[in-house]
Amino acid sequence: MTVDTAVTVPAPVPELAPASAPGASAAEVRVAGTPALHDGPAPLPAPRGPLSAALLSTLRRESTRSVDLRHLLWEGTPADACTDDDLQLSLWLAYELHYRGLAGVDERWEWHPELLWARARWEDQLLAGLELAVPRVVATGATDPTTGAALDPVGDVVAGLTALAEADGEPSVSKFLMRNATAEQFREFLTHRSMYHLKEADPHSWAIPRLSGAVKGALITIQADEYGGGVPAAMHAQLFRRLLASWGLSTTYAELLDRVPGVTLLSTNLISLFGLHRRWRGALVGHLTAFEMSSSVPNARYARGHRRLGGSEAAARFFDEHVVADAVHEQIALHDLAAGLVRAEPTLAGDVLFGARCAAYADQVAAEHQIGAWTAGVSSLRTPVVAAA
């Protein structure tokens, strides 16, 4: 089965927002006026290799206890695990069973022991790849000469997270979009980001029942803002849906999945991996903290690029909201969430830093892919998405 060379999506109303200069489209107005929009299950994508082909074939069948899934193995190497299309799509499908579900798929697959066994093998391979790319750092400061334990794990984590946030990585997607991107490249950027932002905050919320006390309170403070303080139209996922509509892109959940490469799926798969395993709660907290501490400046640049290309003020609210909210979240995440967790459980210091560094690595490889394609004059997507005229 092959993927079409392009998909046509509804265009903005021409008198309000031609595809080359997105504005407040009719679709955008409908989204803003329908805050309770309900996501359906994700559509099944085309396979990207033998593993995802076998998995999709399996998922189309009724879930039964007697099924043998030992053939669902990925034959790649750790060096390729983080960016391999076949593995990343397979992980995404397995994880999506825990979110919106998959269209036409028996929901009992979510907890099928054979599928969980197969997914655990894929996760081990992804973790092996991450260990190659992001070596573990248990302590960044002084250690006990006898045990090797950090003498100041909280200080180590605060210093490590701060240094990571202050590093202005290159290549920078936000700088490129602010200064150089074409409308089509900006549209591609939004397509990549739709894999996370249409379920923004959901993956990190897995940490809530795994934390307690003030640390849980810090996380809920952040997540409450992500979910719009209880106002559906203000949910960040809903603001992003409005942004997609203004650029003539589909707002249907996961409809653009076939277009994005494995390197894009890595970002969401990482959060699901950390979120669905209690033992990785430290990494999940570190990942979220890295997100919050490195969000305000890039979103300000995205907003400038959006406006430079004629984007509407209403749609720009998604970026503007992140500039303001994440400036506050940064301090809560660093001092109350991450440092608070390590203060309560010092042995998780290394995991917190690992999760943060994995977030930075995923951003880096995605940026290298996108900017590499754009500077070469080709699409960063597997197949381009075009807005209808």
Tell me what each language-model feature is.
Residues 2-389:
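Non-heme di-metal
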